[in-house]
Amino acid sequence: MKYLLHIGANKTGTSSIQTMLAANAPALAKAGWVYPDFHRRHAAHHDLALAIKGHPGAGLPEGWRGRLARLTAAPDRRFVFSSEVLFRLVPPAKVARFFPPGQTRVVLYLRDHLGYMLSWYAQAVQGRNVTCSFEDYVQIFHQPLAQYLAGWEEVYGRDSLVLRSFSRAALAGGDVRRDFIGLIEGCDAADFDLSAAESNPSISGNLLFFKKALNAYMTAAEARTDPIPDEFGRLAALKDSFRGRFAATKAEVDLVRRTFAADRTALMRRGLRFEPMPEAVAGHASPDPDTLTEDMRLIKHVALETQMTFLTHAARWQDWHSL
């Protein structure tokens, strides 16, 4: 195979894999592989994925197709590309024009639906202007993963698609980075420096509640603007309750169970194994009324001390001024 194409999915350790690949060019080269620095953003090929889709905001300069063709023409090199944008947002037939079937092995990690939706919701609140509840988010963004998987299998064939379960028990050494290295022909995990991998924790608790409230005062473009999402990643380091899993009630878990029952069955038939869903999810309350005022004041204090960008938008919120 000339290409190893890692397509996600999101919330399956993709940032850790991409950071590891970007930091280990010598280990990859030892086995004849390259992780190209071709318009990488946050160590990933997101802009390339959007350009393949034809997204007007991809931002790649004119002539990128020719440069990509010249880059990958080297007969003595094989190439790893990675972007979770590919799995759900880019038609596989378009991807195949650049990474042809027969020359490409596609790698996809999927996680259980409950963990996926909890993590995706927290990420959406952090990085966009989402204001809806978790329950509403589950119903609005009900996207059967098996449906997308079928599209990739139709273009590349089942034998060329490596489907992996994102669970500690299923991963080599309980680590998605080591698991992925094992899929790169000729590579040995012992040659890789894994110290620089990114953890990318989800925001939680009252920080999640605050960002969701703040989102009502930002446009979609404003909420996505750098460095606002990263600012909330830094705020998550202030308290344990600002990061990790947020609590989900029995009703919320039951909603996820019902909503994705057919998809879960289809993926299990495809060979994935999922643990039974719990009755409820223990985690940080969002909001936590007992510490809400204290936490809001902490967020405001740190934001002012470090002159965070989101302060411009928080100024539109009357309650912010009274803290």
Where are these regions (language model features)?
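Anion-recognition interface
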Residues: 1-323
